Amino acid sequence: RFPGIVANDDVTLKIRKGEIFALLGENGAGKSTLMSVLFGMYEPDEGEIIVRGKKEKIVSPRYASELNIGMVHQHFKLVSNYTIAENIVLGVEPQKKALGLFPYVDMKKANREIAELSKQYGLEVDPTKVVSDLNVSTRQRVEILKMLYRQAEILIFDEPTAVLTPQEIDSLLKIIQNLRDGGKTIILITHKLD
């Protein structure tokens, strides 16, 4: 609930593992709010969330990530002057110890792992490229890789086609099918049927 507004009322969703689930509704219908609750950005006033048969109180995006839930927001959350790899590992950096004592970020390992994930799901990105040099569809792929790098199994896409060209939409749909074929559960939020 927001002051004077009930964003979601009497909502029940049952989504099975490996399913592509579309949540369709007009702008302002509460779709993104509902997914923001599932991702821990908002706490529900009432009701319950059950993930893999267990009742959960998802209090933050970090906790959602621990539950293997990831979200690609309509407005990307990327640092423009960082590389793709730096954006993806931000907050979960792989570390090594110099001389066995001093921790530092192992970007070689990160680049290798990201390149492998990219290839596995048909995302086709170069982890060493700087985000400010990327087009919108490639930035979206970086957001998808951020989820995959954190082992997300439930992937929420908020209005994923809103800023894409028809060709980019076709490419995204293939990526989503690859993700589903890889055992991921997909939730698409959209107000468009095409």
What is the predicted function of each stretch?
Residues 1-194:
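Glycine-rich phosphate-binding loops of nucleotide-dependent enzymes
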